[in-house]
Amino acid sequence: MDTTDRTAEVVLVDYGLGNLRSVTRGLERAGAEVTLSADPDDFSAADGIVLPGVGAFSEGMENAGPFREALVAAAADGQPLFGICLGMQMLLTSSEEAETVGQGDVRGLDLVPGRNVRFDEGQKVPHMGWNELNVARDHPIVEGIDGEYAYFVHSYYAAPDDDAAVVATTDYSVEFPAIVANEAGNVFGTQFHPEKSGETGLQILQNFVDYCLER
């Protein structure tokens, strides 16, 4: 498909958590037209959707509750859905985090089956700073990426039910997924913050924008 005359229209979900300004700037640098929206009706017309996030899993899922149905529908329809940090964790089925703070089982979007788990006791958390990305399999989001460094801030990590969901890994005493994707490939997320990861992050965002145009 010739995408040279098209601009990707991307919706950045505003559910009260996330580095909205820096993610917007990064996407715009990658050539996207970004709409910051708290209206699920905006999702279906977009070329792609970004679910950002900083903070606790339970708060994220509570705030994103009004968007659940629209996000699941968009994913089922094949729209690109990109979760960042907490947004990636919310793509999974559940998280230990809610149980750890006594909130019981909080259900995620269940678009990538699996559970978010805490780093082992004794491991310094949060895992914060630059770390290496090791690509595990092909996916459009990692085009031109392997061995580069990205910026992480997190205490929990994704443990997908299926190893095939792992697109890239990072090592922090334990090897954990840095990028995951669903079986269809249109739902994916990065545990790191591409908007804080310099040229590597910009390449990831560019890959997302290109994928939005090519689907």
Swiss-Prot record:
One of its GO terms (cellular component) is cytoplasm. One of its GO terms (biological process) is L-histidine biosynthetic process. It is found in: Cytoplasm. One of its GO terms (molecular function) is glutaminase activity. Heterodimer of HisH and HisF. PANTHER family: IMIDAZOLE GLYCEROL PHOSPHATE SYNTHASE SUBUNIT HISH. HAMAP family: HisH. This is Imidazole glycerol phosphate synthase subunit HisH. IGPS catalyzes the conversion of PRFAR and glutamine to IGP, AICAR and glutamate. The HisH subunit catalyzes the hydrolysis of glutamine to glutamate and ammonia as part of the synthesis of IGP and AICAR. The resulting ammonia molecule is channeled to the active site of HisF.
